[in-house]
Regions:
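Conserved Class I SAM-dependent methyltransferase catalytic core
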Residues: 147-211
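Mobile active-site "lid"/loop adjacent to the S-adenosyl-L-methionine
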Residues: 121-153
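Conserved beta-strand segments that form the floor/walls of ligand-binding pockets within enzyme
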Residues: 17, 61, 75, 142, ...
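Conserved SAM/SAH cofactor-binding pocket of Class I
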Residues: 28-129, 156
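Conserved beta-strand segments of alpha/beta enzyme cores
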Residues: 15, 70, 94-96, 193-196
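Conserved AdoMet
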Residues: 1-38
Length: 213
């Protein structure tokens, strides 16, 4: 694709380096960032964790838009974090990067007011619906999950939220439109309330927000 060849793309008014190790930021992700900024008091100190940061686009834009935010960004990929660090520097923001898998990461002393994630959620069985450009040029690690456990990463984030998300804290996700109700039910059945689905510009349920009780 054009952006892969030129190793650069535009997201939320800013330039980002991309390569084969990170997903190319998409319009739906801009919508997710906009939703967060609509609901958050951008003048108050706030601590944010972006899980599966990839190019760093979500974390970096939130750091740029929320002056008093303390932003952390996690990814399992060393190569992706290298790109994200370059993007943070190029955009003039401070983001604390964590190299870890959310499936294994544990901390007893890190607490966040907002957790945001665009985790892998495309089932292997949905590959045939994907564009060849995506399949050939973007990291499968960041895209696909097993057909038998497609909510794996959401379940892991629920678990870590027991400790690491503050009371009244918010979570924001991109989700699989075909698993929207299942994803909503996952959060509604735990310690989250006010679970909301949000449609993207194509009227597909692609985002979810919930508040910790």
């Amino acid at each position: 694709p054009y952006t892969t060849l030129f190793r650069s793309t535009f997201f939320f008014g800013s330039d980002f380096i991309v390569d084969k190790h990170v997903l190319i930021p998409r319009p739906e992700t801009e919508e997710l960032v906009s939703w967060i900024l609509e609901k958050v008091d951008t003048k108050q100190p706030i601590k944010i964790l972006d899980i599966g940061t990839g190019s760093g686009c979500i974390a970096i834009i939130l750091a740029k838009q929320i002056a008093q935010a303390e932003v952390y960004a996690m990814d399992v990929s060393t190569a992706a974090l290298s790109i994200a660090k370059k993007n943070a520097e190029a955009n003039g923001v401070v983001v604390q990067f964590i190299e870890a898998s959310i499936l294994e990461w544990q901390s007893q002393d890190m607490f966040f007011d907002i957790i945001v994630s665009n985790p892998p959620y495309v089932r292997e069985s949905e590959k045939e619906m994907m564009s060849p450009n995506v399949l050939n040029y973007e990291p499968h690690l960041a895209l696909f999950v097993d057909n038998n456990n497609p909510l794996l990463f959401y379940k892991a984030i629920v678990e870590m939220s027991k400790i690491n998300l503050t009371s009244e804290g918010l979570i924001y996700f991109e989700i699989n439109e075909y698993l929207a109700e299942e994803t909503k039910s996952l959060f509604s059945s735990t310690f989250f309330e006010s679970v909301q689905l949000k449609k993207d510009i194509f009227s597909k349920n692609r985002m979810l927000c919930a508040r910790k009780c």
